[in-house]
Regions:
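Intracellular effector-coupling site of seven-transmembrane GPCRs
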Residues: 51, 55-58, 203-240
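Fourth transmembrane helix
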Residues: 98-102, 128-159
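Class A (rhodopsin-like) GPCR signature focused on the TM5-ICL3 interface and adjacent 7TM helical core
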Residues: 104-105, 155, 181-211
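Extracellular-loop-to-transmembrane junctions of the mid-late helices
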Residues: 21, 146-153, 167-194
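Structural signature of the GPCR N-terminal helical module
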Residues: 17-79, 102-112, 227, 234
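Helix-to-loop junction signature of class
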Residues: 61-78, 103, 146-160, 227-230, ...
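Intracellular signaling interfaces of 7-transmembrane GPCRs
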Residues: 39-48, 115-132, 196-222, 278-307
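Seventh transmembrane helix
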Residues: 101-102, 231-237, 241-307
Length: 307
């Protein structure tokens, strides 16, 4: 446990940079959530993917908050009761496993939409899944919260008489072993398989479009989707690896470095999501133009995704 009075200037600078990155990640995901909710409140149609993106953004916002609570709680508020550690662990586990399940659901939805298999079982699964997206989102979140609640209670009993970061680390290590076996492997395998199948399907679509001499603009859409799917799989893989090797990252980089690297990949994924999604990208562009106008540039244009 670090005493705030003994922190070096370099460490305090790194802590400030990490805190700003946590805040940036929170704001980026809050932006995604706000845009989609705003469209829904205006009565516009929200796609199944946008529903998952909104839920995923909320879970990532919660994760960013737990990163801040863990880092600053370890340094400044480490004398708080066991309730603090148990509550943070509950929020952290809820957000982590909600993100894993929601990312898996998103990959499966994309795979079902793109794939053109005519197998009766596959077609029935496709119709069932695409018509029950909201139910699947709720189920993913509820199961994750239930899991986090059970292990949060277990952690509360274990650290009842010793609420230190070392005890918290030992509890988290034990939970990581259990979740590696019973919780993370299953959804990640589904996520990996569906992502690979999606990339293969997209590649076949591109091959057929090339042979049919389709325009480059149509091919660019498929290329962007392939890149986004690959980057999503990479980000989720690193995110899960850090979760499962928490103690290694803690030993090498300390608590601050561990959470900094842990949260940076979901943040980068959210930034990339804004880049590839037209309505999100246009909203960012409009915000920039409004800022330019306030700074004295009256010619800065505003765009709209709805014509």
């Amino acid at each position: 446990m670090d005493d705030p009075s003994t922190l070096t200037v370099g460490y305090q600078t790194f802590m400030l940079a990490a805190g700003l990155s946590f805040l940036a990640g929170f704001i980026i995901n809050a932006f995604i959530v706000a845009v989609n909710i705003s469209e829904w409140k205006k009565g516009r149609m929200i796609s199944t993917a946008d529903k998952v993106f909104t839920s995923l953004g909320i879970s990532r916002m919660v994760f960013q908050v737990t990163c801040l609570l863990n880092v600053f709680g370890d340094i400044y508020f480490y004398r708080l009761s066991v309730l603090f550690f148990a509550s943070v662990l509950f929020l952290e586990l809820s957000s982590i496993y909600s993100s894993i399940w929601l990312s898996t659901l998103l990959s499966v939805i994309f795979c079902l939409k793109i794939s053109n298999l005519q197998n009766p079982f596959f077609l029935r699964l496709k119709i069932l899944a695409l018509n029950r997206v909201l139910h699947l989102i709720v189920a993913s979140v509820v199961v994750s919260i239930s899991f986090a609640f059970v292990y949060g209670l277990m952690a509360a009993f274990k650290i009842l008489h010793n609420s230190t970061q070392e005890t918290y680390l030992n509890v988290y290590t034990g939970l990581s072993v259990l979740t590696l076996i019973f919780w993370s492997t299953g959804p990640f395998l589904i996520y990996f398989i569906s992502s690979v199948l999606l990339i293969i399907c997209l590649y076949h679509h591109v091959s057929r479009m090339r042979s049919g001499r389709n325009t480059t603009s149509h091919l660019d859409t498929y290329y962007k989707t392939i890149k986004f799917t690959g980057f999503s799989l990479f980000s989720s893989t690193v995110y899960l690896i850090i979760d499962m090797t928490y103690t290694y990252w803690y030993d090498v980089f300390g608590l601050l470095g561990c959470y900094f690297f842990w949260q940076i990949f979901p943040t980068l994924h959210s930034i990339y999501l804004i880049y590839v999604t037209t309505k999100l990208r246009i909203q960012v562009s409009n915000i920039v133009h409004k800022l330019r106008r306030r700074c004295g540039d009256p010619k800065a244009p505003l765009e709209t995704v709805f014509q």
